[in-house]
Swiss-Prot record:
Protein name, entry field: Urease accessory protein UreD
HAMAP family according to UniProt: UreD
Similarity comment: family membership: Belongs to the UreD family.
Name of the encoding gene: ureD
Keyword Chaperone listed: yes
Amino acid sequence: MKCTGVLQLSAAKKRQKTIISSCYHEGALKVSRPIYLEKDLPFLYLIHVGGGYVDGDVYLTNLDVEEEAELAVTTQSATKVYKTPKKPVVQQTNIHLKKGSVLEYLLDPLISYKGARFIQETTVHIEEDSGFFYSDVITPGWAEDGSLFPYDWIRSKLKVYKKDRLVLFDHLRLEPDEDMSGMLQMDGYTHIGTFLIFHQKADKTFLDRLYDEMEAFDSDVRFGMTSLPASGIILRILARSTGIIENMISRAHSFARRELLGKNGVTWRKY
């Protein structure tokens, strides 16, 4: 399968500091130079050099975080998927976390416009004592008729393996031809967000405290969370605006950083 963009990147710890040990990219995918907003932790910005994803695009990203290394990754801006009359856009991401490593992978929202079809497949392999923070936000794009869900469909599959055992399979399927406003769908909301944590300290006590932190959020929003096998927690959010979901995920991320990593919240410095 010919790819529109490819990114392969590895991070390793050297002299008490994480460095980017190898990096290869081609096509429409680029990556910024590492920015050390924290002394030992490189922050990377994934960059798409085109105006958005279009018909038949295929993107492949491979990230490897070596033993005891720490890496934070985000995007430069939202991912925009435009009309796909012939073939859906496909985005595949493969992540490997070695023993004791930490990856914070928090991307900007996905915006799907009228006629868009999008397949997202993310596979994560986690080794012992590693930590993984992940977010995903899906929002409807603008349509000239004012419809709330102009895209054709979205398929998002997230698989997490710990020691080669499948501990999470999250399959999110959104198809506006169905009643998206009904129960077991979006329940009257338009935007959906996910925040995922895997960390050895993410136990029931942490889950309860995180719930209290989220419950204090005063806005028109619905959310739920549950524990997962192998010290994991998943948070799902429904809202009517991107900003509300981003604020909730930011709060959850800051709380998790403080409680699990002993670090302050992070400002990604996007303008």
